[in-house]
């Protein structure tokens, strides 16, 4: 047992040292922070359990070093420590709860910039030197390069001695621009900023648009009582401080702190710079000293780290998938990578034009994102190891029919394509449509492959007890499937209409139809028999354009689609849905809304549901076609955009009467 533990500790040390060099020296990390931290925690766990195997060279006693031989090493005036970190909000709250504020709650919150740490030393108001963090005791002297950063004042108006910590960064936009011209592109903006700062020729550094935020005033405690006062002084002296830093005191609660963190987390994609978390610090300098330090980090600060929104992986193969509309979508099979809290092994490539634009082929190393919890997608090629780019095949992979191009996408035109058929059934059963419980993609594919079902109507005629002969299907499971099918017959007509998969017909358009007295199968069918009259009628409805109008008319003249509707009508499905709009609710009926901010006592989802039930239509983003923006506390960028577009603003008080 002891030899196994020793070996695991030795292996962990070796691996962590390798990663430290990649991160701090080479600026080319091969693993995400989350993976690195997991290995550090495992090493700490083993060393705590078996202290006899803990050595003085353990990575848990130190933090990584960015020292390079190209620059002179200079000793810091005081240890430049790292930050303790958590990935869980409950752990963050526990850290806050443990601090004895002595009835004087004070804490600051600011984004954690993903850049290159720097320490600035001012003597009598003059920038004397600039050092990298290095190993915390010694740093590389990069003063000559730092002097080229326009946002760092070389001379101050006051003759003061300062020791400041800041984060040198490069904006997302400039990262993409610069990376295009580099022979060896960087994987992220942090590595690029770090690489630029360490260039030997300062004239080269001056050509790059480096930026900086000052986030710590290391000798502020000698002059100020709290961090907010010190920060105000820094601004007055001409230093750039992140405008998103916020100070909380007795008037605030921990809940408000957590809400602000949630707000930053939500908006991080809109920032011009990369952030990898949020930093919390005790504001009171006297309390900081009482809380003290470890050899690694101050006890008065904590970083809440985000799980990675993107990762880097190699494309092993590319397959094409056929959707319910026949659309051909290329998908990359990639090495497993951890992104946004999940391991992913595949990512969409959108379409042929997109593949061509990024020059992607099998074997390339790519950046993969999973922003907003959507389907993982390949963002860009990081390292090109192939020639040319992948080409979508000329024929559908499922039925071999020649594909046709419509806009940016290729489509399989065969209505009887097996892939199209099975995807339509999956869509019909999905949560947003008929929500037929128990019918997973796996079960639907199984039923289709065994030729038990060929379309959604077969779900209502198939004898499910035939499944008893197959492994995994027993009476209870089969009865649950049958009960789910029966329950689906009671779903409202809007759900059935959505489930039919009419191209571009979504929930909002269906609501518009219903609000304009087109709220039944018979009304829609009758209207669409006169194509020209139907087209002009539909175009009169605000929010319905030519494309959607033509798709609706085509659907209600398609024999296959009509046979499906007749089938469901014979099974006594609901073929009409009453939309009652009284005089009081006419303001909402058919109007397009968006919502932003927080609302005391109400979640946004509850407000949306209640207003939808009274005829409102909700968009997820602010566009020129919006009628109203509902604004709560701590409204974000949506409010700014709405004001620029002259969109009417509604407060919580304006809509409160509609929520009863």
UniProtKB/Swiss-Prot annotation:
Transmembrane segments: none annotated. It catalyses: NAD(+) + (deoxyribonucleotide)n-3'-hydroxyl + 5'-phospho-(deoxyribonucleotide)m = (deoxyribonucleotide)n+m + AMP + beta-nicotinamide D-nucleotide. The active site is at residue 112. Pfam families: BRCT (PF00533), DNA_ligase_aden (PF01653), DNA_ligase_OB (PF03120). InterPro entries: BRCT_dom, BRCT_dom_sf, DNA_ligase, DNAligase_adenylation, DNAligase_N, Hlx-hairpin-Hlx_DNA-bd_motif, NA-bd_OB-fold, NAD_DNA_ligase_OB. CDD domains: BRCT_DNA_ligase_like, LIGANc. Its cofactor is Mg(2+); Mn(2+). Belongs to the NAD-dependent DNA ligase family. LigA subfamily. This is DNA ligase. It comes from Borreliella burgdorferi (strain ATCC 35210 / DSM 4680 / CIP 102532 / B31). The lineage of its organism: Bacteria, Pseudomonadati, Spirochaetota, Spirochaetia, Spirochaetales. The gene is ligA.
